[in-house]
Amino acid sequence: MVIHSDEVPQEAQPERSMVLRRVINADRHSAAISVTWVRITGHHDRVVNQDCDRVYYVIEGAGRFQVGDGAPVEAVAGGDFVFIPRGTPYEFDGNMLYLVMNGPAFRAGSDAVLPRAL
């Protein structure tokens, strides 16, 4: 199956400084994996997900990630990957275009929002 990104509807989430496209998702494709294209221009909530492992791939731009309580804040840029094991709190900010992949697939409501650390 070929999925043309320009045929996937964009969703604006201005309260989160994000625009996204849910390219591969459990409702239409597979419960095993989800892939979302995202452009962010600000801060992403501190969250934890007990259901899935998550990988971020930064396509372009730059930002900062904190993965784990008390972990160092690390810079990321185009070409970098960030792995988030399930059950690990994290947050990030920046001006980036990235892909986020979840295994198993992301389910709405599965992220628990935590108090901000960055």
Name each model-derived stretch.
Residues 1-34, 39-47, 113-118:
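A short, N-terminal "cap"/entry segment at the start of jelly-roll beta-barrel domains
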Residues 32, 95-113:
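A short hydrophobic beta-strand segment most commonly corresponding to one strand
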Residues 37-40, 49-67:
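Short, conserved beta-strand element in jelly-roll/cupin
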Residues 47-50, 90:
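Histidine-centered divalent metal-coordination motifs
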Residues 55, 71-73, 98-99, 107:
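Short, surface-exposed beta-strand-loop junctions and turns on beta-sheet-rich folds
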Residues 70-87:
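Short acidic-glycine-tyrosine-enriched beta hairpin
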Residues 87-88, 93:
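Short, surface-exposed secondary-structure boundary micro-motifs
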